[in-house]
Amino acid sequence: MVRMTAVCTAKTVSPVPSTRKEFKGAIAELRKKLNAVILAHYYQDPEIQDIADFIGDSLELSRRAASTNADVIVFCGVHFMAETAKILSPEKIVLLPDLEAGCSLADDCPADEFAAFRDKHPDHIVVSYINCTAAVKAQSDLICTSSNAVALVSQLPKDRPILFAPDQNLGRWVQKQSGRELTIWPGRCMVHETFSEEALLKLKMMHPEAKVIAHPECLERLLELADYVGSTSKLLEYTETNPGTKFIVLTEPGILHQMKQRMPNKEFMDVPGIDGCSCNECPYMRLNTLEKLWRCLSTMKPSIEIEEGVRQKALIPIQRMLNMKEKQEASQH
């Protein structure tokens, strides 16, 4: 069982800053005083990204969490990411500015239901996308991210069947790219499933020269319309190296902040959700704010706590992922 508790180690709370500038200054002071590191996912609000020490996707941030010398890790993302940081660095204090920052995909795969599903396939290698709870990770043989899933699955023994969870769209894409047959858990991301195909086709008609880039959590019919499919970090890299100057981006629009910062002379367009709604923004990612970031550093809460037995079991497949990735990178040099 995973416990997410609010642990208070500070006796007093400083006066609440009144402006964004004051919040940023107070956060910088607390970060230095506490020897804290602020990790932010690409889907965070721009003002959170701008104050972070490191910005990245799930794989990059898990590596940072494993290697940091900081005493306190503040994870500006969602709770499965903060859990991963705690799994990798149990001796450190891991803070999440808002405990309500969950994940529809992780919620789509309850640990007890996953255990029953896994028991029906006892001979399968269990590969779980990092977007799942610590309790599901603890039941897995290997963890992957969207940036390394195809490479890792391709390395698995050919004579062993594979169970993949929890994202069905990513699973189908990995199956297609790797050529491996997967038994796939039927989970989905509420954001990546809402992109409007009609809106995408209209944008393509209006900007025929634009490259369409998509995250593999999108629906298959949208991926088929893309010029490039990859994780958030891979999408960012593609826009930097591709000579094109216009890009239609099928993922959470928080990534556009980094794209525009790095390539101010290029144009980036996000795709609206079905019926033109603004649901292409992840409501959970956007729960973290400057005030909540300041408050969690001021009070040292909410903090993430994981039952040690669960943590140790969850660490094994995460470490296996990191080791396989290191071996793969070493073989390429």
Curated annotation (Swiss-Prot):
It catalyses: iminosuccinate + dihydroxyacetone phosphate = quinolinate + phosphate + 2 H2O + H(+). GO terms for cellular component: cytosol. Pfam families: NadA. This is Quinolinate synthase. GO terms for biological process: 'de novo' NAD biosynthetic process from L-aspartate. GO terms for molecular function: 4 iron, 4 sulfur cluster binding; metal ion binding; quinolinate synthetase A activity. It is an enzyme of class 2 (transferase). The keyword Transferase applies. [4Fe-4S] cluster binds at C103, C189, C282. Binds 1 [4Fe-4S] cluster per subunit. Its EC number is 2.5.1.72. Its cofactor is [4Fe-4S] cluster. Iminosuccinate binds at H41, S58, Y129, I130, N131, S146, H215, P216, E217, T232. It comes from the Bacteria. Gene3D superfamilies: NadA-like. Keywords: 4Fe-4S, Cytoplasm, Iron, Iron-sulfur, Metal-binding, Pyridine nucleotide biosynthesis, Transferase. Catalyzes the condensation of iminoaspartate with dihydroxyacetone phosphate to form quinolinate. Pathway: Cofactor biosynthesis; NAD(+) biosynthesis; quinolinate from iminoaspartate: step 1/1. The keyword Membrane does not apply. SUPFAM superfamilies: NadA-like.
